[in-house]
Amino acid sequence: MWRNGIVYRAVKNFVRHNSTNNAAKNLKSIKVEDIQNRIENIPIENYRNFSIVAHIDHGKSTLSDRLLEITGVISKTEGTSGQRVLDKLEVEKERGITIKAQTCSMIYNDKRNGQDFLLHLIDTPGHVDFRDEVSRSYKACNGAILLVDASKGVQSQTVANFYLAYSMGLKLIPVINKIDLNVAEVEKTAGQIESTFEMSQDEIIKVSSKSGINIQEKLLPAVIDRIPPPTGIKNKPFRALLVDSWYDSYLGVVLLVHVVDGSIKKGDKISSAITQMKYEIKEIGIMHPDRVNTGKLTTGQVGYIVPGMKNSQDAKIGDTFMKVGLESQTEILPGFEETKPMVFVGAFPADGVEFKALDDDINRLVLNDKSVTIEMENSNALGQGWRLGFLGSLHASVFKERLEKEYGSQLIITQPTVPYLIEYEDGTIKEVTNPNEFPTNRKAKGVKSIANVQEPYVEAIMTLPDEYLGNVITLCDNHRGKQVEIKYMDSGQSNAIKQVMLRYEIPLFELVDNFFGRLKSVSQGYATLDYEDIGFRPSDIVKLELLINGTTIDAITSILHRSKVNKVGTEWVKNFKKYVKSQQYEVVIQARINNSKIIARETIKARRKDVLAKLHASDITRRKKLLVKQKEGKKKLKMRSIGNIQINTDAYQEFLRR
């Protein structure tokens, strides 16, 4: 049945992010030699490397499926089944979002002139947490489709990703999608595109990704005509940009690269500009949409390399790969930056979950998500666990969901925090990502004096109907936001609902503390949000702790702005009281700031045990002895129980989940 060994290995070894059965069926019909021959005969002038820029749910993945179908990469049945071919993760399909950047090479015959074109589509994430994925993908592109839903209009992620793509010099093609919906407002959306992005309405292409209207007739010709080809030089030494990587249990680390100059083939040796490590290429080819071994890659192409790399941490996204021996003749590509986590949580096994098994599951998941950082952590309340760093709150949520769905593992997650910079008067700076490490006793002998504490800020972009403007402004003000810009997006139609774009500078911590949920609530679900990092700023930051009988519960500790601590501290003690059962002695629950000042308190009175119940009423001597013994026992019990109140793990889980 499988006579072509290359095709067999491609199917057998392909396990990237839960590949589908449909993908395997499609590979059966692929003749690798035909693909190789057609690509060989396509000049670089006929290459088009492009991406799709869109807000979540505007139809980006559906458009990708339709392009794959029209170019013959997948069958019509696969393209219309709603399987979202380039979204490999189960959580991507369930949430309707793209998390990992994916790519697919398509060979398209232009009926206007009969020429073949090699189209490299890179399907990027839209959410701000995965902005690094987006910017890396854009570096491999020369253009992008700016996709806007006709029923929703221009929204925040569209705006943010437009400016990112524009700043990187990509040629943008404005496209209005879902024009066949009954609620589509095509002309209004066209007016918004014109006023927001200063694009002529004559440039706009109107399509339906679902039904395929105008995809082949107008969109694909526009990709060919408007997006320029790659500008690399074939006879220069090989160099390639590392766009993405993933871990394959058979092959090790697989690299997704954009060949900027030169060419490379199986058996060649390459080296990393960042790690200086050298590798021999075991397999090389294109994604179609799964791995197809073509034996080589050349200038302008986007494809995969299997280098025999064992450790996924050695794959530095944005790295430059060169041929061994030609490093001195090869210019390193600019712009490499290590991915930096901006949201941190404590993670602990839920009740009944084995630590070792969960540790193995977390490390397996991190093999395909190098942006997650891991450190071991111990808690007096929850035991041994981990401190995990993520790109954002959605990233953390997706990681937890993947852990539960793919491995069946349950976690207790502490309140998220962000990195803070502690600047000391001697000029040294320390970054703190764990609330328990935040310095409190700043005047103690031998402790370095603190000059200031800085917290990260972001510029938030929100789009919303103007009827909710007052609610959203109030929300932003309550979250320490500073208004930068308010702009009405003119649609050119007098009877249309006016859309407003707001720009605010807001502390990042305020956003990760359920800001998006509150934004949706005050706008009845109509507001959208995107944001970008704008650096650190001095702020009045303190440490808030929860104490039981004078002992800190380290799992319930946070770093907050001083203006928030009284409200949060009062909520903490009232809520936590619900989960502590009465004891044979008084239990005191307190909230404390900076290891010194108590700002809130709740008391659970002692539960009295009737030790006299079984005694005869006239046995006075015995009664007195038992009462004295009970009193002494309470003293001893209370001494043993300070900081050791028996609280079920479920109580912490419920408290932290609220």
UniProtKB/Swiss-Prot annotation:
GO cellular component terms listed in the entry, alphabetical order: mitochondrial inner membrane; mitochondrial matrix
Locations listed in the record: Mitochondrion inner membrane
Name of protein: Translation factor GUF1, mitochondrial
General function of this protein: Promotes mitochondrial protein synthesis. May act as a fidelity factor of the translation reaction, by catalyzing a one-codon backward translocation of tRNAs on improperly translocated ribosomes. Binds to mitochondrial ribosomes in a GTP-dependent manner.
Residues annotated to bind GTP: 54-61, 123-127, 177-180
Topology of this chain in the membrane: Peripheral membrane protein
Keywords of this entry: GTP-binding, Hydrolase, Membrane, Mitochondrion, Mitochondrion inner membrane, Nucleotide-binding, Protein biosynthesis
Domain of life of the source: Eukaryota
Lineage, uppermost ranks: Eukaryota, Fungi, Dikarya, Ascomycota, Saccharomycotina
